[in-house]
Amino acid sequence: MRITVSAIKADVGGIGGHTLPSSGLLDAVRRKVSSSSLLIDHYIGYCGDDVHIVMTHTRGTDNSDIHKLAWDAFMEGTRVAKEEGLYGAGQDLLRDSFSGNVKGMGPGVAELEFEERANEAFTVFAADKTEPGAFNYPFYRMFVDSLSNTGLIVNKSLAEGVVINIMDVSKARTARLVLWEDKPTIEAALMYPGRFVVSSVETRDGEPIASASTDRLHNIAGTYVGKDDPICLVRTQKRFPATEEAGSCFNNPHYVAGNTRGSHHMPLMPVRLNSPASINFCIPIVEALVFSMHEGRLTGPFDGFSTPDWDDVRRTATRRAHAMRRQGFVHPATLVPDELEYAEGYRSRMDVLDSKMVPLKDSGPAGTGRAYEDPD
């Protein structure tokens, strides 16, 4: 049976700030989705102040009816958010009306269409207070780094390598890179998660494994309106990464862009399902929703980051967060200017600085005339 799994998320309001959605907001989203006859099954939850809708159906990816259902559900949530005076009501809905596809309209989208296996397993990773590039490092560990994932050695399909599709989010273009031939190029791209992000992964013979949301909100709105808060789908088991291999790629809380006002680097903390965002400077968080599926019917989710061992990972993330925040505003605690310029306050400060700058007197020709040499 050919099934599509669509995971669509949006921030449409939080209690007292960017914390978590209200029960009224969630109920409004659930009522709208539950009333639809388009779906086989669905699950609705939240990560921080982002609501995610996981849907199964047979209509394929980028389907207008499915995307409109999610859009309408988020609009219903926005209506309640405004009635309740929630902060950031409708924040991620950057267009006035639906235009056939929620991509480019604010919500994050990850979708996979595939022939369902007899025991289909997949995990949804939903993040808050960060950007799509936050998944680059876990994806690298999952599909490239055999020190992190022994499956890349002992599993025949994974050992053959996968195809990683990488998007240049600043220029809206993609590259199809193949392991193991393109390994250095993949690594060079993933060095800068603010620009190059993994959009999807497939086997060398074209079987889809993973899909991730890639929209940057400031690219759509032209100014800072909140972090992008990505979501991704990863099929697991058999010829794909084991569920444990996929999950363990989040056990080293790496530094990601995001945090309060989207202006800092902080570690990505794995948290339990339906966790609010912290008000301890808003540490970026990620949840793992582990599902089984048969004929499009969902069982789960199991809370992938709920077991006791993840408490120690959370303590590591907390220590790293405190260490970074002790550096204050000095880079790399804060983002590079290219990312901060979308914040109006930062732009205005830079305009003042620029107005006070005067050129240096001519000090002779620039450069030494030496040819380029590789760094030692």
UniProtKB/Swiss-Prot annotation:
Effect of residue 224 to F: Shows slightly decreased FBP phosphatase activity, whereas FBP aldolase activity is nearly completely abolished
Binding site for dihydroxyacetone phosphate: 18, 129, 261
Any Pfam family: FBPase_3
Effect of residue 227 to R: Shows enhanced FBP phosphatase activity, whereas FBP aldolase activity is completely abolished
UniProt-annotated binding residues for beta-D-fructose 1,6-bisphosphate: 18, 87, 100-101, 129, 237-238, 261, 342
Binding site for Mg(2+) 3: 227-229
Outcome when changing residue 228 to N: Shows completely abolition of both FBP aldolase and FBP phosphatase activities
Domain remark text: Consists of a single catalytic domain, but remoldels its active-site architecture via a large structural change to exhibit dual activities.
Function of the molecule: Catalyzes two subsequent steps in gluconeogenesis: the aldol condensation of dihydroxyacetone phosphate (DHAP) and glyceraldehyde-3-phosphate (GA3P) to fructose-1,6-bisphosphate (FBP), and the dephosphorylation of FBP to fructose-6-phosphate (F6P).
Protein name: Fructose-1,6-bisphosphate aldolase/phosphatase
